[in-house]
Amino acid sequence: MRLLFLAVLRPHTGNAVTAGRLRDHLEAAGHMCVLRDAFDFESPSEIANLIMDENLEAALALHLYRGGRLLQGHSIPFGVIFGGTDLNEDANHKEKKEVMGKVLEEARFAVAFTEAMKDTAQVQWPHATGKIFVQSQGIATIPNANFNWNTFLQQSEIDQSADNLYIFLIICGLRPVKDPLYLVDAFSEWHQETPNVYMVIVGPEVDPVFTREVKERVRRAAGVRLIREMCQEDLHAVVKSCFALVNSSVSEGMSAAILEAMDLEVPVLARNIPGNSAVVEHGVTGLLFSNPQEFIQLAKRLVSDPALEKEIVTNGREYVRTHHSWQVERDTYQRLIRKLETNLED
């Protein structure tokens, strides 16, 4: 089939990485996939022109509100994938919730990353019960074997021996919902007591106003660094070399960065929110914190307890291998897309 795939494609964001991986799954099944950024279109009529020009037969959208609403009212069948924003933010706005309800009426299937997301969606839109499937994110990491960690540290203005460093890494697009400043003050205090601990924030500048605020705060914060986005292979190499991966988001659908860190055998410290607690079991596959002070306590414990670190890393790797199989994700999407083929034949 000739498929249209709409997603938010800001480079080096979780959405773009997920969309690229899912496109690969669909193309591996023999489909031709036209991947487009939902933000490039303002109305369904622009999509209608694209469908006609490209002779598209079916469609998929990552995010119901940002992408799915643009697929309504055309003659082609489509499926949708819930993003964290759909359920954590947009569902709280009456008009957006109504729009997403109409999208679900027309969609042939919908995918949620977790059982909790599915449950939330079914409460919000009871009429969609029966067409929502759960498929967690499939994870495959490919760290750049030639990446130079010492050069990265120098570029980050961290002038200490790599042997005795503890780098806590936050990977996120710079926007308020990711809350990268949540831990900055507490961490900076800790760094002044313990100069070999650093926090490095890596990610694209998504929100220009918020980015200025982040840069200003980080510039004044001892032991905290801000690094521009980088390609996936280099980012995986950074994760593999750091001491721990940190997630301080206000809300998440399912953080690929957390799962990638687990796959790379790096301990995870995550803010205790539903999206994170769905994949991190406290003390088993990672550590969950509810405030900056608790984060510092847990980080200090992790630094001083190699046995805990080893246990968390072992369990995290096993969890990802068992529950976030790239192959299972591929099989699921290739099977679901056949629902759109069936509709073409009807």
From Swiss-Prot:
Species per Swiss-Prot/TrEMBL record:
Mus musculus
The text of the family note is: Belongs to the glycosyltransferase group 1 family. Glycosyltransferase 4 subfamily.
EC assignment: 2.4.-.-
* GO cellular component terms attached to this protein's record: cytosol; extracellular region
Single Gene Ontology MF annotation: glycosyltransferase activity
UniProt cross-references to InterPro entries, sorted A to Z:
Glyco_trans_1 (IPR001296), Glycosyltransferase_G1 (IPR052622)
Which UniProt keywords are listed? Glycosyltransferase, Secreted, Signal, Transferase
Give one Pfam family, short name only.
Glycos_transf_1
Q: Which EC class is this protein assigned?
A: transferase
Q: Which Gene3D superfamilies match?
A: Glycogen Phosphorylase B
Ranges that cross the membrane = none
- This chain's protein is named Glycosyltransferase 1 domain-containing protein 1
Signal sequence extent: 1-16
The compartments listed are:
Secreted
Chief location of this protein?
Answer: secreted
